[in-house]
Amino acid sequence: MSVLQVLHIPDERLRKVAKPVEEVNAEIQRIVDDMFETMYAEEGIGLAATQVDIHQRIIVIDVSENRDERLVLINPELLEKSGETGIEEGCLSIPKQRALVPRAEKVKIRALDRDGKPFELEADGLLAICIQHEMDHLVGKLFMDYLSPLKQQRIRQKVEKLDRLKARA
């Protein structure tokens, strides 16, 4: 397994729409494993393949405290959503920035697991929010797109400054 490079805004590759996975094979499973390794290394709770410049419909999530409840979503589809909620969300592609984002309180999805087996999942709370956040990535949408233009500009400037400082170090 290896840690992949996470793209940061304003990288336009984050805006690409991911294509469906045609076959879950050893290559896809390797990508899933690398994505988990990357997500844990970056201390995230979710990661979409788009964020690591792989434009396929793959998501990995682990919202557990012990980091031992891996969830793989390949070709996820939103079937139902209900209620309203929101938390201050962060994103590995928008480092050290957070903002309140409106989300559905509950979701029902269909996806393939790491072995290509179809399943359905009903989720609420943090897991439901994380699923929605990561599914947005698959269509090129970021949490900051829900914010006002002024807030978006401020976030972009802060991230660009952080990346410049990191490049000098």
Swiss-Prot record:
<keyword id="KW-0648">Protein biosynthesis</keyword>
<comment type="function">
    <text>Removes the formyl group from the N-terminal Met of newly synthesized proteins. Requires at least a dipeptide for an efficient rate of reaction. N-terminal L-methionine is a prerequisite for activity but the enzyme has broad specificity at other positions.</text>
</comment>
<comment type="similarity">
    <text>Belongs to the polypeptide deformylase family.</text>
</comment>
<protein>
    <recommendedName>
        <fullName>Peptide deformylase</fullName>
        <ecNumber>3.5.1.88</ecNumber>
    </recommendedName>
</protein>
<feature type="active site">
    <location>
        <position position="134"/>
    </location>
</feature>
<dbReference type="GO" id="GO:0043686">
    <property type="term" value="P:co-translational protein modification"/>
</dbReference>
<keyword id="KW-0479">Metal-binding</keyword>
<dbReference type="Pfam" id="PF01327">
    <property type="entry name" value="Pep_deformylase"/>
</dbReference>
<dbReference type="GO" id="GO:0042586">
    <property type="term" value="F:peptide deformylase activity"/>
</dbReference>
<keyword id="KW-0378">Hydrolase</keyword>
<dbReference type="GO" id="GO:0006412">
    <property type="term" value="P:translation"/>
</dbReference>
<keyword id="KW-0408">Iron</keyword>
<feature type="binding site">
    <location>
        <position position="91"/>
    </location>
    <ligand>
        <name>Fe cation</name>
    </ligand>
</feature>
<feature type="binding site">
    <location>
        <position position="133"/>
    </location>
    <ligand>
        <name>Fe cation</name>
    </ligand>
</feature>
<feature type="binding site">
    <location>
        <position position="137"/>
    </location>
    <ligand>
        <name>Fe cation</name>
    </ligand>
</feature>
<dbReference type="GO" id="GO:0046872">
    <property type="term" value="F:metal ion binding"/>
</dbReference>
<dbReference type="InterPro" id="IPR023635">
    <property type="entry name" value="Peptide_deformylase"/>
</dbReference>
<dbReference type="InterPro" id="IPR036821">
    <property type="entry name" value="Peptide_deformylase_sf"/>
</dbReference>
